[in-house]
From Swiss-Prot:
Keywords: DNA-binding, Methyltransferase, Restriction system, S-adenosyl-L-methionine, Transferase. The gene is hpaIM. This is Type II methyltransferase M.HpaI. CDD domains: AdoMet_MTases. The lineage of its organism: Bacteria, Pseudomonadati, Pseudomonadota, Gammaproteobacteria, Pasteurellales. It is an enzyme of class 2 (transferase). Pfam families: N6_N4_Mtase. Its EC number is 2.1.1.72.
Amino acid sequence: MDQRLICSNAIKALKNLEENSIDLIITDPPYNLGKDYGTTDDNLNFNKYLEFSHEWLEECYRVLKPHGTIYIFMGMKYISYIYKILEQDLGMYFNSWITWYYTQGIGKTRGYSPRHDDILMFTKHPKKFTFNLDRIRVPQKYYRSVNNMRGANPSNVWEFSHVHYCNKNRKPHPTQKPEALYERMILASSNEGDIVLDPFVGSGTLNFVCKHLNRSGIGIDINKEYIEMAKERLDSEFNGFDSIDERMKRCPNDLSDPVIRKQYIINHINWFLKNHENAREEFLNEVKTKYYKKMTQEEKRLLDKENNLSFDFS
């Protein structure tokens, strides 16, 4: 399927799209927190940011088909205002407030460490919208005879880890999202051959996932470097989506890449044991069970040496 990448101001590019031409919109806009996206648009004053948000959301509403859906990632500071714009100003219909939970977040010493992001799901029609539940069912936690044997409906709390440094798909973008996150939304709210849009495409996750799910993708970003990054990503080898991050359970299930494994060992295992000494034996067993056979002789020697995990690769 066709994958379009447009280097442009989002609002300007949206105005060039036809009315009622998009089946699904998924986007992670600037949160106005001063992050460096290569532009100054993430540091607007309060009213300017709301004006900017209203303008691009209004254009999204215009291009969205009558049965279409929009998913928006948004930080807590502005999410209630985005909700108001969608529901009261544009007349869209609220469907779900999704919590994306992840195990590693930003460390804080004067407050609780953030461990989730929020995603708003709105539809253009209250009842007539695409939602393919059977494409996204998850295994039942407990078996009951009344259960749907195809699996359970995912809750509105989704557990996917961040795209960490140990992930091969990591790109130099400050807010790269996991492919599996987009995969679930695209499978649920679009069909093969549909057109999916991201007005703030960043590292190109949406187009990459659309390509391998047989959807046409349109990605817009004002940063030329990000557009080039997204183009290169489309041409990269596909080995499945990063549905389960290696660090989700603290001990990766697959560390076949020796470079990643070495970095993981140096940066993570020592930290874990320093802070979880009471779990030392259990953790060592997990390491051996899950990827001991994949280790080099040097790594095995370091692991076995009196179980002293003070790894030194110098």
